[in-house]
């Protein structure tokens, strides 16, 4: 009896030991769900924007580098120009103000002959010194002006492509016009030939029209003689 009672008590204890789990309800936020589903497109647009910004920055850097290189070349040319002008001024001064001294020794006295040559190069250039100086100042002001900014290479490529397409269209139109003119000339020549041939045939028919009585009599006389 004791064993059976224990088995019954164990079975009751196991059956009553099961616990019921509570229900789990999942709630989705529509906004977060939409953001998750459209995230691929957003990331694609962001990558595209980043690529465009990177291209713009590279283009700006390239333009800046080209401007700096042009500015350096311009300064170098300006320096060379100034050196050439200075050398020309020195040469002009050396030519326009030269002195030669020659001494002749005699037993009683000494003779010194000094030759001073003062050439005016402005006469050869047909310019006065003041005007020439003013022109040099204007040239220097012009050379000291800053260089123009380089154009946009992308826009220049687009303009080149547009001009090429326009030129091709113009050439095609010219070719079509030439073909039409040639066809019109050929048609006019053919029509002239036809009209000339028809006129020639008509004239022959007119010439071969009805014969006169005199011609018929002569023809009948010839026939009678041939029969005899």
UniProtKB/Swiss-Prot annotation:
Q: Which residues form the signal peptide?
A: none
Residue ranges of the region described as Disordered: 1-22, 126-228
Q: Where in the cell is it found?
A: Nucleus, Nucleolus
Q: Does the keyword RNA-binding apply?
A: yes
Skewed-composition ranges (Basic residues): 171-180, 204-220
Parts forming coiled coils: 40-103
Biased region (Basic and acidic residues) positions are 126-145, 181-195
GO cellular component labels: nucleolus
GO: which molecular function terms? rRNA binding
Q: Where is the composition biased (Polar residues)?
A: 158-170
Q: Which Pfam families match?
A: Nop25 (PF09805)
**Protein keywords:** Coiled coil, Nucleus, RNA-binding, rRNA-binding
Q: Does the keyword Nucleotide-binding apply?
A: no
Please give the family membership noted in the entry: Belongs to the RRP17 family.
Against PANTHER family, the record matches this protein to: NUCLEOLAR PROTEIN 12
Protein function: May bind to rRNA.
Protein name, per record: Nucleolar protein 12
